[in-house]
From Swiss-Prot:
<comment type="similarity">
    <text>Belongs to the PRR15 family.</text>
</comment>
<feature type="region of interest" description="Disordered">
    <location>
        <begin position="29"/>
        <end position="51"/>
    </location>
</feature>
<dbReference type="Pfam" id="PF15321">
    <property type="entry name" value="ATAD4"/>
</dbReference>
<dbReference type="InterPro" id="IPR028237">
    <property type="entry name" value="PRR15"/>
</dbReference>
<protein>
    <recommendedName>
        <fullName>Proline-rich protein 15-like protein</fullName>
    </recommendedName>
</protein>
């Protein structure tokens, strides 16, 4: 008579183990004082273009809204180009002249 109903077992959740360290501070930040910026990459570095693109993708202000994750797991930047009517004032004029 003290059996637990099967439906109670469906709502029980196992406690997930939480890591003791949530994130680690890189050594470059730990060595700098206060809010000083870490040393930037060298201009002759072949990965400087990659690093600058990565910084743009991981920008905290946009919260990843401009980044799409593909099926393979790679991050791709969304590029949305919109034509404004102010840039193309004659966009609808041609249509009216042809009688459509």
């Amino acid at each position: 008579m003290t059996e637990v109903g099967w439906w109670k077992l469906t709502f029980l959740r196992k406690k997930k183990s939480t890591p003791k360290v949530l994130y680690e501070i890189p050594d470059t930040y730990a060595q700098t004082e206060g809010g000083a910026e870490p040393p930037g990459p060298d201009a002759g570095d072949p990965h400087s273009d990659f690093n600058s693109r990565l910084e743009k993708i991981v920008d905290k202000n946009t919260k990843g809204k401009h980044v799409k994750v593909s099926n393979s797991g790679r991050f791709k930047e969304k590029k949305k180009v919109r034509a404004m009517l102010a840039e193309n004032p004659n966009l609808f004029d041609d249509r009216e002249n042809k009688g459509q």
